[in-house]
Amino acid sequence: MDILKSIENEQIRTDLPKLEIGDFIKVHAKIKEGTRERIQVFEGTVIALKGSGLKETFTVRRISYGVGVERVFPVNSPRVDRIDVVRKGVVRRAKLYYLRDRVGKAAKIKEKLDRK
């Protein structure tokens, strides 16, 4: 069992920031179209973190042209180029699935302010 954990720990990415529920982030994902590869930016709110280790994933939600769009990204995937945390959010739940039913200001998340 220790052999599996040691191999898994070698492959975990350490270059990504610590994500928390409610954060507004930009995910730079590599998209392959035929022979070309480009980077597509998907920005939205982190509504769920699942799993641990190599199998850890996060779900990002945004509103695009009035329609809610959610994407699930594996944290340790080579397809995720980088993640930028735009602003931190203050929430009191582990999963923000209730945001799916909310529209406009009701779906807003408070911003975490840094104390000086």
From Swiss-Prot:
GO terms for biological process: translation. GO terms for cellular component: cytosolic large ribosomal subunit. One of its GO terms (molecular function) is structural constituent of ribosome. Keywords: Ribonucleoprotein, Ribosomal protein. NCBIfam families: rplS_bact. Belongs to the bacterial ribosomal protein bL19 family. This protein is located at the 30S-50S ribosomal subunit interface and may play a role in the structure and function of the aminoacyl-tRNA binding site. This is Large ribosomal subunit protein bL19. It comes from Ruminiclostridium cellulolyticum (strain ATCC 35319 / DSM 5812 / JCM 6584 / H10) (Clostridium cellulolyticum). The gene is rplS.
